[in-house]
C-alpha cells in the first residue's frame, strides 16, 4: 500500500512539474514567485495575443525585452536598467524600423520604406513632421511654428501665436473669398467669412485645413487622405492609406503597424508566464 501511495505521489509530482510547477505573477511591473518573493531569471509571457521574452533581476525588468508578432517576427525591443526603460524600438513585420524612443524622450517614427514621419527633440521641445518626399512639413516648438509645402517653401509662420510676414499678399476674389499669394503661387484659400483657411501644396491639392471657429485642424496627403487630425483631448496620425498609425487620447498613446495591429509594449494583460532559466 505504501509503495502504491508513494508511486501515486511521484506521478502527481511529475504532473505538477509538467504543468509548470512554480507559478509566477507579474504585478505592477514586478515579477513574483509563488511565495511572493521577487523573482530572478529569464521569463516568457504573453501581453494580449503577443509573446514577450526578457530578464528580471530581483523582480525588476533588466536588460533586453523582445515582443513578437504572432508570426514570430519582432514587434518591439525594449531595454531596461534596474526596472527603468531606457530605450524602445518598434518594428514593422518585415523587420523595418517603425519607431525609436529614447531615455530622454526623443521620438522618431518612420514609414515602412524608412522615410521619417515625425521626430521630436526633447531638449529643444521641438516637433518636426515630414512630407512624403522627406522635406519638413511643419516644425514647431514652444514659441514658433512654421508650415512648409513639399518644395520646402514657407507658407505660414506663427510666432507667439501671431502670424508673421512671409512675403505673401491677400487677394480678394469676385465671389468674396480670398487667396493668399506668394510670388506667383497661390499658397492658401480662405472662405468669405474668413473662418476656414486651406493651405495648398505647390500643385494645388489641399495640405492643411484650419477652421478658426472650431479650432479644428486637418493635414492631408497629396492623394487626399488625412495625414493628421486634431481631436478633443488629442490627435491622430495616419499612414498614406488613411489607416491610423499613432493616436493620442488624453494621457494615452497607441501605435499601430500598417496592417492595423496595435503595438502593445509594456506589461499589460500578462498571461502564460513561464520561467526559461
Where are the regions that the model predicts?
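Bacterial N-terminal signal peptides
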Residues: 8-15
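Positively charged n-region of N-terminal signal peptides that target proteins for export
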Residues: 1-4
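Composition-driven detection of intrinsically disordered, low-complexity segments
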Residues: 7-8, 234
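Glycine/tyrosine- and acidic-biased, solvent-exposed loop/turn segments at the edges of beta-strands
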Residues: 17-277
